[in-house]
């Protein structure tokens, strides 16, 4: 009886782990907007792997490149985060107003990482500066 209880307890505790599992996929399995984004801004960068993660019933995608760049997409193919610690993120991949703010206020710095959530954007520059923008791309503050 004790063994059965322990087994059921272990099984019950492992279910959340099963709900969030990663699986390798091919580029053709990405949502169309994600494929277009990669084609437009990272076409010259070789992909090392693509993963789909099911998290709370929603698909999320992570694309890793051989130059150590990484892009995370939501279930609709909209980017959630872009990062590259070996080379700057292509300027054209960034929202125009964020790109202009960085160019005007941080001459010589490039964007190394950008994250989008339901409140706005967090941007990390190559000079170590961290910036926050709202959803309308207005600068809010330095982090």
Please describe what each predicted stretch is.
Residues 1-26, 38:
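Bacterial Sec-dependent N-terminal signal peptides
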Residues 22-143:
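Interaction-mediating elements
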């Amino acid at each position: 009886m004790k063994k059965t209880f322990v087994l059921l307890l272990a099984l019950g505790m492992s279910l959340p782990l099963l709900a969030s599992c990663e699986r390798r996929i091919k580029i053709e399995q990405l949502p169309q907007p994600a494929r277009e984004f990669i084609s437009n801004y990272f076409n010259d960068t070789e992909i090392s792997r693509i993963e789909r993660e099911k998290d709370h019933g929603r698909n999320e995608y992570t694309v890793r490149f051989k130059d150590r760049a990484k892009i995370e997409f939501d279930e609709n193919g909209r980017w959630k985060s872009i990062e590259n610690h070996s080379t700057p993120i292509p300027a054209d991949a960034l929202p125009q107003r964020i790109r202009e703010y960085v160019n005007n206020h941080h001459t010589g710095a490039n964007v190394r990482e950008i994250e989008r959530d339901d409140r706005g954007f967090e941007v990390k520059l190559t000079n170590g500066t961290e910036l926050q923008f709202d959803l309308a791309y207005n600068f809010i503050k330095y982090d």
